[in-house]
Amino acid sequence: MKFAKCLTLTVALAIAFAAAALQAQDQRQPAPLVPKFVKGSASDVIAADIFDTIIYLPVKIGGQGPYSFVLDTGNGGTPVLDEKLARALGVPLGTRIPITGGAGSTPVDLYPIEKLDLSMPGLTFSEVPAATLPLDLMDPHWGKHKDGLVGGTVFSVAITDIDYAKKTVRFSDPKTFTPAAGEVIPIEVFGQPFVRAKVFLHGSSQPVEAFLMVDTGVRVTTFNSPFSKTNKLVEQSPKSLATMTGFGINGASWGTIGRVQAIELGSIRIENPVVDFSTDTAGALSSDRFAGILGADMLRRFHVVFDYPGQRMILEKNAEFGAPFEFDMSGLRLVAEGKDFSRIKVFHVADKTPAQAAGLQAGDEIRTVDGRKASTFNWETLRAYFQRPGRTVKLEIVRDGKPIAATLTLERLV
């Protein structure tokens, strides 16, 4: 199941490298990117594919496509294409740059792209600097293929209206934008948007101030390891689970899943959220320059408008606002392999969990879940299936070519 929080942070650092590489190749200052709205001062209302809280939009590259791009505030720089797609399209690539910086420490290759033409329904950009990364490395952990990421290029010049409930996105010209209903939350934009929030801990009436990156490309809200350690966040959580929490293009990330009493944004109070307390000692989640990440599992509870030029975010509660925060109750971290993501395998088993008690191991392939073929689940339905406390789940797995039966009883782990 997908906890790919570090991908976008790695990408943010990668884009900095790409920008430096492009500047070295051409000392001229690039002209500001100007979006062209095909009809008036706004794009079409774009039907978004919101899968596991992550927003996928149709994007054309040089008139070809559309391809599936993640709309990602965590990508504060230029768009990112999957390297295989860029090569298939014959896009000219610059000099290879090995990078690290997110989850894990294994270098991967970035290639700068001097310019691309990008378009979405009702909106076009010409000659946009971009970069490639091997985004397909993340596909098994996301349970879905992505062709690219688009973020700061659009957010910096267009008002972005995201209606999670209706699964739509619309971009507007800041000059003609009329503010929507909802609470205005000030943001500070440093490539990515940041908010100042109050974090209330269990057992304390005094909040902790937190400077959080707002990231639509991350599911679970995460606190960086220095912030978690300084404020003893793990100790205050009523229950917690130490486990693998992320897998970025540079490798795995580790942390402790737990809860805080509440997070406040302006006058909006979000009760008892599930959060990740990072224990990383290297990479972006070990940074003390910001407290952590406000993820999409919180954002999906609102109609969200990002107004970078106006330094504000507008939040209007939707029907999901009061829904409880839940987390996996099995102890399994799964990956989906194969062209259609139909092969479900165990990637990691957390200690002292139902999955460990049932004898499940990394590498096991799950064939059936309560008699139903595992391939008939998608990421969202499978996650929901493992989030019901007290449910007994019978699995048929294959290990070393041999079928094995396993039974586990789900329990609330955080």
State what each model feature region is.
Residues 1-5:
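Positively charged n-region of N-terminal signal peptides that target proteins for export
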Residues 8-18:
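Bacterial N-terminal signal peptides
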Residues 21-414:
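Pepsin/retropepsin-fold aspartyl endopeptidases
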